[in-house]
Amino acid sequence: MKQNITTPALQNIKITDPLFGHYADVVAEKLLPYQWEVLNDRIPGVEKSHSVENLRIAAGESSAQRQGAVFCDTDAYKWLEAVAYCLASGRGKQYEQTADELIDLIAKAQEPDGYLDTYYTL
């Protein structure tokens, strides 16, 4: 027996449970702004991410030396993913411009063939 399973669009999914709704609000209101500051190395006492700075270096916007973990680029991508989910659910509109700017930076940092991994390209 074969069933057709369809995935609903994110915009059509509404979190109505008080517990999970609370966590979705916390992500949009607290986690995203905090994580953005971490990605930009602006939180005293927190280990530097170097994520956004490495993208700036790859984009030619900074002459600093690449630093951080081999995989630190992915932190910026995961932040963008979280913003996208928040936007799709009607939360996080305030991050749209910042997300657009990060997307532009990523596009500028890519190799001509689209490849991007600052550990290997810098």
Task: Give short role names for the model-derived ranges.
Residues 1-122:
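Glycan-recognition and catalytic cores of secretory/periplasmic carbohydrate-active enzymes
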